Amino acid sequence: KNWRVMYLDIDVHHGDGVQWLFYDDPEVLTVSLHESGRYLYPGTGGVHEMGEAAGRGFSMNVPLEPYTQDGSFLEVFDRVVPYALEQFRPDALLVQCGADAHFSDPLADLLLTTRAYETVFRRLLALADEHTEGRLVLTFGGGYALDATVRIWAMLTLLALERDLPEALP
């Protein structure tokens, strides 16, 4: 069976490499929520980048303005990700869980808190159960504020393993 895969990139940088790899492939939907390329490397990820040939319409980019905070990010996530899953109907969801949109990251200007990451991860687990029968691959990536990155990745691991989160992650 040819699997349809949705690739979601929530790293602060545009998911350009994966997007270009599947730019003409209608079996892979790439969705990237990232800080706008007008301000941040690699300078790509505009809404006009939608795929080509048979893959036209299978690349979705949501460039966010610098200083985007939890509420706005979660609103965008809630409007885009469930809709993309409902419309595309993938067999599996692969998520690049960058930790560099955290407010303490020195290389970018999105202002997410650890609580926003927790909310996103919980929603991803529920969405995967609902739309892909739980077929979910989570990868780590991005994160240059080491304390925040370790906390975010530890939290993601605990949630994926269905473990309780401690009151404070060290």
Question: What does each of the following model-derived ranges do?
Answer:
Residues 1-170:
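A general "terminal functional-core" signal
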